[in-house]
């Protein structure tokens, strides 16, 4: 051997291998995009400052000017940081520094996801989301392929994991965390089926609650997606609970209860705020809730997006979830036939993605119709024909639409 293959400071044969031309072209585009974004961000920031100084910001930013300004500033800072990282990322690709480029791709993925959320809250759904969405797809692909050593490590780990999964299935431990630190293995397969099952179970539980507590004997469709019996807030909530509480399942029940209460209430507040600022939609409000005969302080503090009683329900739900329901759900998930488990996951992932995208688009065009700003384009006409206001009001019976509550610019 003419060099030490185990020395991390010495590049391996795969790391010395040249970057493909198509990736180099993309690297140049990243650098140009980053360089071009910085002056654009500075110019936009100056426009915002000028509008605030001249006092005409309210006309451009709408009724919720403070929230809009906060989101705009956050978006500007995010865009500036992303531009700088994008330049460095492009240079690393050109210089064949694959491992550094792979690390930066993870940061850019996180920044791009947040950028998408901010754009939706400020402008709704539109073609302007294509650029960050395409960039997100490219970054995800590059993060898995740009560093050959990481790709080889993942392939070896995948093959080893298949062998371990088969052994675990024989021992009745499939899906469990082999380290013993958590209960369930936090992989995409397990978390996706937790999400899907809880979307359905959460909707059933909410319907029962509404018929027995909120409005006895009256059925109301509480679905949260355009198609199917799904309420995604419960699906995402269950995934979040599973990821956070996974290592708490052996802890004191009081600790699990408190962590679940804080986590669930915070999640409920964020989802309510996001839907209201993005689409002017309010699906629930606890502003009327009382605590010992006085206005619930948590409801007052969060603008009615959660309350003390439901925070306690989140706490109790998290405790029941991690102690009783998750183990049984894991057994149910493992009943999916071995040969079809991954193909079934891919098929249902695509179905849920299509449903999710169409749900967001239908909400966006519903908002625009109520606001009187619907564009005269084919996609708007499609949603206006098949998912008009009457359809949306009947489908999302728990939602109220108020465009003035949104932060659209």
Where are these regions (language model features)?
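Aromatic-rich, lipid-facing transmembrane alpha helices and their immediate juxtamembrane interface loops
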Residues: 2-409
